[in-house]
Amino acid sequence: MNNLKQGKFITFEGGEGIGKSTQSQMLYEYLQSQNTPVILTREVGGTIVAEKMREILVHEELLPMSELFQAMAARYDHMARKIIPALQEGHIVICDRFIDSTVCYQGLELENGIDLVYNLHKTLMPSLMPDITFFIDVEPDTAIKRVNSRNMNNKFDIRGIDFYKKIYYCFKELSNRFPERIKTIKASDLSPLEVHELIKKHL
């Protein structure tokens, strides 16, 4: 899929409170235990510059188009400085969020936003898409209860159930659109370890 690289690019996607960061970490630790060259990173962020952009993106109220370009600028830095070099060295790269999150969080706020985001991404890095994406499928009602039970620390956490549903159904739509790349892991009633075992079966 990606002619820029020799390694493998794995992403985790979904809304807030679904456990994707936990699953990213668990997969990273598993691959390390197998002596597999692997790095773990995240978006928005992953580099010094991109992490600074993240602070603005998750805490400030931006205009929709400004928010999109902030996310894309951070991604370009992240890809150029971290993801692509690691892939070219033959590493597996695990990324907590990537392009599909930009589609659902920023693209939905704009007219024809889904296509706009993917087209922008292709313009930035035409060959770089994940080899496999795990959509951690947790029902919005369950997800928002989880978020409400923890210290909410960004503008996306504190939005209401309608926002959670919108994001959830966007990821569902993407998983239907790209079934070969996006693997849906139904996780509402599973423990983190059970979810991890399902993920390992797709590797």
Swiss-Prot record:
One Gene Ontology molecular-function label: dTMP kinase activity
Residues the record lists as binding ATP: G14, G15, E16, G17, I18, G19, K20, S21
Keywords associated with the record: ATP-binding, Kinase, Nucleotide biosynthesis, Nucleotide-binding, Transferase
One GO biological process term: dTTP biosynthetic process
UniProt keyword Cell division, yes or no: no
EC number: 2.7.4.9
Pfam families: Thymidylate_kin (PF02223)
GO annotation, cellular component aspect: cytosol
Catalytic activity: dTMP + ATP = dTDP + ADP
Free-text function comment from the UniProt entry: Phosphorylation of dTMP to form dTDP in both de novo and salvage pathways of dTTP synthesis.
NCBIfam families: DTMP_kinase
Annotated family: Belongs to the thymidylate kinase family.
Protein name stated in the entry: Thymidylate kinase
Species this protein is from: Rickettsia rickettsii (strain Sheila Smith)
